[in-house]
Amino acid sequence: MLFRSVTIGETTFGGREELVDSTGIMDYGSLIYVALQRSRTAKEAIQVMTDLVKEYGYYSSGESFSIADPNEVWILEMIGKGPGVKGAVWVAVRIPDDCIAAHANQSRIHQFNMNDKDNCLYSPDVISFAREKGYFDGMNKDFSFSAAYNPLDFGGVRFCEARVWSFYNMFNKSVGDTYLPYIQGDSKEPMPLYIKPSRKLSVRDVQAAMRDHYEGTPLDITNDPGAGPFKTPYRLSPLSFKVGDQEYFNERPISTQQTAFTFVSQMRANLPDAIGGVLWFGTDDANMTVFAPVYCCSDRIPDCYSGKEADCVTFSWDSAFWIYNWVADMIRPRYSLMIDDMRAVQNNLEDTYANAQAGIESSAMSLYEKDPVKAKEFLTNYSCMTAESAIDSWKKLGEFLIVKYNDGAVKKMAKDGTILRPETGHCAPLVRPGDRKSTRLNSSHSTSSRMPSSA
């Protein structure tokens, strides 16, 4: 998101490998950055991105972009034309105002209305090119971008589409029930690009959805043997593995430890862009981070996000990335023991930011009416302050977790939330999670499943 409140996210679907053009200039990251700089609306961003690949060539593999402004949300899907062939084939569909959509490393646009110019855009050769390459030979009305350029395989359904299903299932159980057979491989009817949720979603709803591990569904990974005695919803890479000659797999949930950063973008047409555009941003895994507000008018970033003192091989106590990873790596192996301690701090911070939002924006609006520059400075300072305060709280959380759970035993807590210390000054008797009386391995069912045979 930049200062005009246009937001672009992306997910790589790869698609047909023979369509990658290594001579192209514009990769998907460059398309995003340039479009954000040049666009005032989502539709303008689509025009900028497609014009750029037409003129300079497209370097990346298949991409799905979510492009939004305060009034519209679009999904744009794009793939190249092969080595040395400039340009790309693409289609973009507008998401209706009363609907939600999701994408997760698999192309999601199937049939589209070629006559609805207000809600559907596409390259002139999106179908003819597929015919030329032998990917499609039916009627135009039956053409599916996804089927032609990113045919589904087992991984596409179970590792990618399943995450979309879980998102839909959270907000419309009827849709979830309808498409569970598709996710489990018992139906070939694909999910729609978008659905109507059973209620209006809030920012907090979307933040919670980003933390999902299929909890409470048939794909729940907290109850199989891989979850261990502390029901961790995390599995080490790779997703599939072999035992003897048999191949198995673990589920791939929305929230995963391989995440570098996550965000929920909020755009509102009833406010000036400087105030209405908020990027709720966190580093590392969505489940283990704090979504702190960064207003789109900010002219500097918090020091903890800057990377001045850290990189991927250099730890720093001033780096948000490393502090969130430090705490998360403590929690994952002892998840059920420690997650509530983390969640209490996380909820307190995010509730504080959410409850303060109306007041902060009211103050910013008063400033904006008199001096927009001062309003932007005010929101920049607030954005930096919230990010840094979250890191300070997370450092204290990490210190607390080390003490409370040191050496595999759990110290008892006083009613005020501090670690219980008897009058003698020594530690109170410990709770030992390894004792069968307090912890049992629950392996009632397994989602570490056999891969289907290739036959």
Question: Where are the regions that the model predicts?
Answer:
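Short, solvent-exposed loop/turn segments at secondary-structure junctions
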Residues: G14, N270, S446
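Short, small-residue-biased leader/transition segments that mark boundaries at the very start
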Residues: M1-L2, L441-S444, M451
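Structured, non-membrane catalytic/scaffold regions adjacent to prosthetic-group chemistry
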Residues: V6, E10-T11, G15-I95, I100-A102, ...
